[in-house]
Amino acid sequence: MALITDIHTHSAFSHDSETDLKIMLSSALNKGVCFYGVAEHFDYDVLYGKTERELCIIDEENYFHTARHLQEDYAGVMNVLVGAEFGYTENENAHTMYKATVEKYAPDFIVNSIHTDNGIDYFFGEPYYTYVNGERVARPKKQAYERYLELIRRSLDAPYPYDIVAHIGYVTRYAPYADKRMPYGEYAEKIDEILLAIIQKNKILEINGKNFNSGKYVSATLPDFDMVERYFALGGRNISYASDAHAPNQIIEGRKEIVARLKAIGFTHFTVPCRGEYIKIPL
């Protein structure tokens, strides 16, 4: 029987979840998860150039203290990985804070993600717009999406450690366009640059199944499988599965279907990062 992994989940330590970490862990265990990765949001990408700690949403000391104790409680029963999701920004103050978090708390793994442009999350819509003669107008889709892909590529050169490259295609979730898709063929050059860098840097491409069965987003997975197929064709083999769960019912959502698709492409294992080691788990 294959071991079940879910690497990159959240709890109430993140600003967008209301579920206690203990409940998330209990639910994961009940669902048979063997490797469960907690990656709470460290949203230093919304600093707007400031350094005041009160702007940082997460209570990092409380999080790591609590999670490490729970990790000990589950030892021998479920492998709990205590990680962090670092929202990339070009803000050097944020880079310094991420480095300090790594040095002080040594997360088991780090997820590298793009949620924002100029400190504003795509969720709020602003990165899709510009101002012309004082009037707010939508950017052309290609311009907005290429800007997003450029940010991902820059994030791969982040001056702090990370293991997983998360949910490529996040920009499509909240886009105002009639056709929100970001097909590989239309952005091949920039996507190939990203995928090749992931391979060359020996990082892990995340297959994110958040809301897989809900039909809420244009893509059932991030990235779309055309990009995953291209990653495999380029030689990429390090992949991880993430439900990106923020509530118990979302844990391992879509995993069975995603595994079937990955096997059809030719993948044979997931890669689970833990303290610098890559653990290979058969699909």
PLM features per residue range, with description:
Residues I207, S214-Y241, K256:
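Extended hydrophobic/aromatic segments used for targeting, binding, or gating
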Residues A2-D6, F35-G37, N79-G83, D108-V111, ...:
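Structural preference for beta-strand elements that scaffold enzyme active sites
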Residues H8, A28, I110, H167, ...:
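Conserved, mostly hydrophobic/aromatic
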Residues A188-I204, N211, G215-A220:
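Active-site acidic/histidine proton-transfer and metal-coordination neighborhood
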Residues M1-A100, K104, Y174-A188, G209, ...:
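An N-terminally biased module of ancient metal coordination in phosphate/nucleic-acid-related enzymes
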Residues R153, P159-Y162, D179-M182, E189, ...:
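C-terminal functional module detector
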Residues K50, I57-Q200:
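Extended substrate/RNA-proximal surfaces in nucleic-acid metabolism proteins
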Residues I168, G236-I252, V272-R275:
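Short acidic/histidine-rich active-site segments
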